[in-house]
Amino acid sequence: MATLFIADLHLCVEEPAITAGFLRFLAGEARKADALYILGDLFEAWIGDDDPNPLHHQMAAAIKAVSDSGVPCYFIHGNRDFLLGKRFARESGMTLLPEEKVLELYGRRVLIMHGDTLCTDDAGYQAFRAKVHKPWLQTLFLALPLFVRKRIAARMRANSKEANSSKSLAIMDVNQNAVVNAMEKHQVQWLIHGHTHRPAVHELIANQQPAFRVVLGAWHTEGSMVKVTADDVELIHFPF
């Protein structure tokens, strides 16, 4: 058996091929797993659990079917869907996890997260993140009419795209000191995350021992997952 990790699907109605690929994944590979962990940015945007978007209901039902089949499903918020709440989690059968979680997997201690908190060189993004994660601001935003939230979200996405276009790739990647600090804080030799869309397995030193950082890929033209078994940790790409 295996535990599966995915992230950065950025599901939206404009990308039906990705949605179809995810549905096939849920109906196939996911049903064979010990557990499924979604490490953020499942959706391109999330403006509240009360959004009647049919795609959201379709995904909730599909994930719930996996959960009902006996495969526990877990979710860590990403920078695109950090407002995903308890209502959607309940409808989809997912358990919401904190932004950093340590798992005991087949004899390994593994730290999982979305990964945006590791990009500490991007000071502008970190300041924005700190602001939008304030509970009072989230409560205020979610109290706004849905059409207002949609306009605000569209403007924020446009601003983010414009800001990122002028940033270097290095700034938007993880900071190595932040990686080591996180792994040493949790006393782990394995870290799995997404966010950067740069799939790879990196070797480093943490806790004065060899350590590994496994980065999930985004679902653009193919799927990406990390498969953890008793024997191996594999980064796998597969066609939709």
Curated annotation (Swiss-Prot):
Keyword annotations of the record: Cell inner membrane, Cell membrane, Hydrolase, Lipid A biosynthesis, Lipid biosynthesis, Lipid metabolism, Manganese, Membrane, Metal-binding
Top-tier EC class: hydrolase
Cofactor binding notes: Binds 2 Mn(2+) ions per subunit in a binuclear metal center.
Required cofactor names: Mn(2+)
Positions annotated to bind substrate: N79, R80, D122, S160, N164, K167, H195
Topology term for the membrane: Peripheral membrane protein
Residue sites binding Mn(2+) 2 per the record: D41, N79, H114, H195
Residues annotated as binding Mn(2+) 1: D8, H10, D41, H197
GO molecular function annotations of the record: manganese ion binding; UDP-2,3-diacylglucosamine hydrolase activity
Reaction(s) catalysed by this chain's protein: UDP-2-N,3-O-bis[(3R)-3-hydroxytetradecanoyl]-alpha-D-glucosamine + H2O = 2-N,3-O-bis[(3R)-3-hydroxytetradecanoyl]-alpha-D-glucosaminyl 1-phosphate + UMP + 2 H(+)
One Pfam match: Metallophos
Cellular component, GO annotation: cytoplasm; extrinsic component of plasma membrane
SUPFAM superfamilies (alphabetical): Metallo-dependent phosphatases (SSF56300)
Cell compartment(s), UniProt: Cell inner membrane
Family indicated by similarity: Belongs to the LpxH family.
Functional summary from the UniProt entry: Hydrolyzes the pyrophosphate bond of UDP-2,3-diacylglucosamine to yield 2,3-diacylglucosamine 1-phosphate (lipid X) and UMP by catalyzing the attack of water at the alpha-P atom. Involved in the biosynthesis of lipid A, a phosphorylated glycolipid that anchors the lipopolysaccharide to the outer membrane of the cell.
Cross-referenced PANTHER family: UDP-2,3-DIACYLGLUCOSAMINE HYDROLASE, UDP-2,3-DIACYLGLUCOSAMINE HYDROLASE-RELATED
Protein name per UniProt: UDP-2,3-diacylglucosamine hydrolase
Species: Escherichia coli O127:H6 (strain E2348/69 / EPEC)
Lineage per the UniProt record: Bacteria, Pseudomonadati, Pseudomonadota, Gammaproteobacteria, Enterobacterales
